[in-house]
Each structure stands twice: as C-alpha cells, then as structure tokens.
C-alpha cells in the first residue's frame, strides 16, 4: 500500500505506465511543485527540535496564527495543545518524550494540513489514534478540506468505509474497487476484513 501511494508524490517512479496528477505525468512535474501540492503523513510520526509552532510552520512557512489554529482544529490537536502551559510555544523534547504517540501523530497531521495541499496522503498514519478521535478526524477532514483530495491508507475498515472509493489490495495486487457497500456485497477479501473488525450491528447495517 505504501509503495503505491509513494508513486503519487514521486518518492519512487513507476517502471511501467504512468502516474498522473491533475492530468500531468508526475515525471514531467518539478519536485518543488509536487511538494507544494502534495503533503504526506507517513506511518512513523517524526517531529523535530523546536516548538510545536516551529514544527507546524515546516508545512507552510508563510502561515499565520489563523492557519495554525485551523490545522490544530482539523487534526484534533487543539484541545490537548491548549492545555499545555506554553501552548504552541511548547518545546518538543528529544524523541518527543513529552508527547504521547497519538499526540505526535495528530501534530504530524496538523503539519501536513498546513498550506492547504491539493492532495493529502495518510499512509496508515492514524494507527495511534483511538477510534473516537479517528472518527472525529475523518469527519473534520471531510467538512473542512473540500478542495483537497484525501488518500487514506489503512487496515481499519472504519477509517475507510465512508470514502468515495475504496481500493482493496491483496498480496500487493489490486483486487477490487468500489464503495463500502458495493465491496461488502461483491468482494470476498473485503467482506472477510469487515467481518473480522465490525460488530454484528455494523455488519447488519451494510
């Protein structure tokens, strides 16, 4: 899954065929352009030395406090950051020891939201979030990033089930595409995943 989405920002290139962004082969696009319009939240949450604000501004050096507040709100970071003594001026300790895994992940998401990218890729990057926070994040993304195409790489059915289109990969191969309801009814691989993760009530509502 990661290999597939890494082709979009051109972290690696296809050997056959092409990957197009807004009608253009990514190999014909300048790297600076791709980095500007495509932001990626990787699996591993990496924050850097400095304050929370310093880290967020890495996503958009020209951002103001309003942009920061927006990114914190959408990423579900606003509440815990507001409770910190120094707020966004809180220094991040070595290896981010003063933050939990979920907090680090949310701040990485906030940084990716900065600059309002046209494409936002989540590479299995909500794994440290509890289900309630994950659901709130997906709701906020849908409500606030109307002009952004969002790719969600996840092993959680609940994370992807409301997506406009789901791609099912099995042993590295694309085996089906469709909506949650379509795939549950027509694809055995997807249905088995659903049955292993969803409650009887959730399955019955499909």
Indicate residue ranges for each PLM-predicted region.
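Helix-to-loop junction immediately C-terminal to a conserved catalytic motif
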Residues: 8-9
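ABC nucleotide-binding domain "signature motif"
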Residues: 15-25, 165-166, 174
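ABC ATPase nucleotide-binding domain helical subdomain, centered on the C-loop/LSGGQ "ABC signature"
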Residues: 18-20, 28, 35, 53-94, ...
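C-terminal portion of ABC ATPase nucleotide-binding domains
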Residues: 83, 139, 161-206
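Catalytic Walker B motif of ABC-type/P-loop ATPase nucleotide-binding domains
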Residues: 120-123
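Conserved catalytic loops of ABC-family nucleotide-binding domains
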Residues: 143-152, 160
């Amino acid at each position: 899954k990661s290999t597939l989405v890494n082709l979009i920002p051109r972290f690696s290139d296809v050997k056959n065929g092409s990957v197009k962004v807004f009608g253009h082969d990514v190999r014909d696009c300048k790297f600076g352009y791709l980095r500007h319009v495509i932001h990626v939240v990787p699996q591993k949450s990496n924050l850097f030395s400095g304050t929370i604000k310093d880290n967020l501004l890495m996503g958009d050096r020209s951002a103001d406090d309003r942009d920061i507040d927006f990114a914190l709100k959408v990423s579900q970071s606003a509440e815990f950051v507001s409770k910190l003594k120094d707020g966004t001026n809180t220094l991040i300790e070595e290896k981010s020891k003063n933050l939990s895994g979920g907090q680090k992940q949310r701040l990485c998401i906030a940084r990716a939201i900065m600059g309002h990218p046209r494409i936002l890729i989540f590479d299995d990057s909500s794994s440290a979030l509890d289900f309630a926070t994950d659901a709130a994040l997906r709701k906020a993304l849908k409500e606030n990033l109307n002009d952004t195409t969002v790719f969600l790489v996840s092993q959680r059915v609940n994370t992807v089930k409301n997506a406009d289109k789901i791609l099912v990969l099995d042993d590295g191969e694309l085996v089906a595409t469709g909506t949650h309801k379509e795939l549950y009814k027509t694809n055995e691989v997807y249905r088995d995943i659903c049955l292993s993760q969803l409650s009887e009530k959730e399955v019955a509502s499909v």
